[in-house]
Amino acid sequence: MKKIRKLTEADVTAESAFFMQRRQVLKALGISAAALSLPNAAHADLLSWFKGNDRPPAPAGKPLEFSKPTAWQNNLPLTPEDKVSGYNNFYEFGLDKADPAANAGSLKTDPWTLKISGEVAKPLTLDHDALTRRFPLEERIYRMRCVEAWSMVVPWIGFPLNKLLALAEPTSNAKYVAFETIYAPEQMPGQQDRFIGGGLKYPYVEGLRLDEAMHPLTLLTVGVYGKALPPQNGAPVRLIVPWKYGFKGIKSIVSIKLTRERPPTTWNLAAPDEYGFYANVNPHVDHPRWSQATERFIGAGGILDVQRQPTLLFNGYADQVASLYRGLDLRENF
């Protein structure tokens, strides 16, 4: 495993740069302005977050047993746990960054089953306990880059997705892997109300090429900071693909299906000119409405300590994954 390059410090970001305009997409989808947070309110919410650690801590999850392989430990500065668990995109629980932490307590994660089906020789249905018993858990410190041009460094706990897929024995027809979030409108207000959920079509769906899913960096994740995932971070099981933008990291997964054809994905369905299927982190391919050349790293300090830094190709994992895309036009296949 090649060494991951260390993040660099840069200039402080101006307040006006913090608020990304992804909500404009939702307006284009027919969501009324009254249903969305006003820019000033959004700025105030973000500023209140960065004042310091004055928010109540997220409920503690169950402690997990896991190893810490040296290949996945590094000197990257971690984003504090309260920010990882309190600053989220999970539109099933609301559009503002604080909404998931405030509203996701309604999600029932026990019992939980995960179904693996499609182009496999051995379809599987596993409950959450079986998942964590069958596969040894390990902590991996990964960069996380949001398409909104902010980033974190997070100590995820999970196991390589390829281990689960190998258990199901993909057939020669399998070319893609489709993922689906639980559909539970009675528990997820954003699925119940199009204004709360941003007008997206639910359940949330995502997809990868099979070779991407089988890559050793791709993690099926059940914990963070030594404990089981809190609901707002995608409990009880979510996907982490560290070289892709965060919206590829589908949360609260109930179905993994191997397919012959490329599966639909939620944000690509909503705005195909803005959110591609691949969604590889690429500083040379801008979002139509903002640059992807730099990012704001969310670390331990307040707003005056927030660091702006260059975005790295494939989020710093180019040595490990660039070969997956040899010969592919990354501008066209964004």
UniProtKB/Swiss-Prot annotation:
GO CC terms in record: periplasmic space
Keywords, ordered alphabetically: Metal-binding, Molybdenum, Oxidoreductase, Periplasm, Signal
Compartment list: Periplasm
Main location: periplasm
Reaction it catalyzes: L-methionyl-[protein] + a quinone + H2O = L-methionyl-(S)-S-oxide-[protein] + a quinol; L-methionyl-[protein] + a quinone + H2O = L-methionyl-(R)-S-oxide-[protein] + a quinol
Cofactor comment: Binds 1 Mo-molybdopterin (Mo-MPT) cofactor per subunit.
Cofactor: Mo-molybdopterin
SUPFAM superfamilies the UniProt entry points to: Oxidoreductase molybdopterin-binding domain
Protein EC: 1.8.5.-
Entry binding sites for Mo-molybdopterin: 88, 91-92, 146, 181, 233, 238, 249-251
GO MF entries: metal ion binding; molybdopterin cofactor binding; oxidoreductase activity, acting on a sulfur group of donors, quinone or similar compound as acceptor
GO-annotated biological processes: protein repair
Signal peptide: 1-44
InterPro entries per record: MsrP, OxRdtase_Mopterin-bd_dom, OxRdtase_Mopterin-bd_sf, TAT_signal
Post-translational modifications reported in the UniProt record: Predicted to be exported by the Tat system. The position of the signal peptide cleavage has not been experimentally proven.
Subunit organization: Heterodimer of a catalytic subunit (MsrP) and a heme-binding subunit (MsrQ).
Family note: Belongs to the MsrP family.
Function: Part of the MsrPQ system that repairs oxidized periplasmic proteins containing methionine sulfoxide residues (Met-O), using respiratory chain electrons. Thus protects these proteins from oxidative-stress damage caused by reactive species of oxygen and chlorine generated by the host defense mechanisms. MsrPQ is essential for the maintenance of envelope integrity under bleach stress, rescuing a wide series of structurally unrelated periplasmic proteins from methionine oxidation, including the primary periplasmic chaperone SurA and the lipoprotein Pal.
Name recorded for this polypeptide: Protein-methionine-sulfoxide reductase catalytic subunit MsrP
Species in which this protein is naturally found: Escherichia fergusonii (strain ATCC 35469 / DSM 13698 / CCUG 18766 / IAM 14443 / JCM 21226 / LMG 7866 / NBRC 102419 / NCTC 12128 / CDC 0568-73)
